[in-house]
């Protein structure tokens, strides 16, 4: 389905390059012009875009912490869950990660404490 939509857009906008969408263990990857780009569809979920908008337009101010939580099926690699949650913290706040401390229990549970630019703490479970 994604490939069909991609082909439609490439034709519509006359890109002139062939492209493909590949399913990987941690989501989807776009292959175009010899380059591979990871797709981040979670950034377009309304709840995250609205939260980002409230932070950027000043509706919410003085943020000191962000908390993210995720419970995923066992077949989804923990690394991809961590990557997604850190990306969400970065996306919503508009700040980059400065440092991370991780505490885990095997390969299925982890707590991350990340410090973002400006001293914002991100707690990821």
Region roles according to the model:
Residues 2-75:
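A contiguous active-site-proximal alpha/beta segment in oxidoreductase catalytic domains
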Residues 66-125:
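Rossmann-like dinucleotide-binding domain that binds NAD(P)(H)
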């Amino acid at each position: 389905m994604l490939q069909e939509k991609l082909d439609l857009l490439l034709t519509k906008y006359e890109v002139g390059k062939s492209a493909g969408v590949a399913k990987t263990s941690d989501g989807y990857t776009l292959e175009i012009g010899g380059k591979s780009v990871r797709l981040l569809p979670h950034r377009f979920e309304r709840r995250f875009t609205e939260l980002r908008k409230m932070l950027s337009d000043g509706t919410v101010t003085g943020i000191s912490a962000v908390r993210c939580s995720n419970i995923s099926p066992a077949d989804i690699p923990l690394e991809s869950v961590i990557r997604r949650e850190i990306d969400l913290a970065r996306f919503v706040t508009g700040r980059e990660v400065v440092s991370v401390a991780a505490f885990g229990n095997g390969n299925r549970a982890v707590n991350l404490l990340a410090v973002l630019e400006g001293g914002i703490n991100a707690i990821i479970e």
